[in-house]
């Protein structure tokens, strides 16, 4: 696939890819590229079941979550058979954006200063009482 022009690229529809989701024919989509992993099932270090769960669909998010090595990424290129048709790319669910929440600084002074101060005072008082008994 490397170095090929756009007209040499074989495009597959999402419907066609979804038909290849068993051990006899296992296709997945990674970054809009279509991979035939049928011959790789038994070699996969994470086990064949991991690949079969993703078969026939987009495995990009799961592939990236695992944190595959550079060698694994290079090896994966040997299984590319084409690309997802541009018309079907919008049909793939995009990963949701991470929601980041912040706490207002004026509301956290209580937990940042008062509670630790009271806790330290209580510990000091208990220590003093303990030492006084000896």
From Swiss-Prot:
Function statement: Cytochrome b5 is a membrane-bound hemoprotein functioning as an electron carrier for several membrane-bound oxygenases.
Q: Which organism is it from?
A: Mus musculus (Mouse)
Which terms does the UniProt entry file under GO BP? Answer: fatty acid metabolic process
The similarity comment for this entry is: Belongs to the cytochrome b5 family.
| Keyword flag Cell membrane | no
Residues bearing PTM N6-acetyllysine: 7, 10, 19
Q: Does the keyword Iron-sulfur apply?
A: no
Q: Where in the cell is it found?
A: Endoplasmic reticulum membrane; Microsome membrane
> Binding residues for heme, per the UniProt record?
44, 68
Domain of life, per UniProt, equals: Eukaryota
Q: How does it sit in the membrane?
A: Single-pass membrane protein
Q: What is this protein called?
A: Cytochrome b5
What keywords does the record list, in alphabetical order? Answer: Acetylation, Electron transport, Endoplasmic reticulum, Heme, Iron, Membrane, Metal-binding, Microsome, Transmembrane, Transmembrane helix, Transport
Q: Which residues carry this modification: N-acetylalanine?
A: 2
Residue ranges of domain Cytochrome b5 heme-binding in the record = 9-85
Q: Where are the transmembrane segments?
A: 109-131
Q: What Gene Ontology molecular function terms does this protein carry?
A: enzyme binding; heme binding; metal ion binding; stearoyl-CoA 9-desaturase activity
Major location category of this protein: endoplasmic reticulum
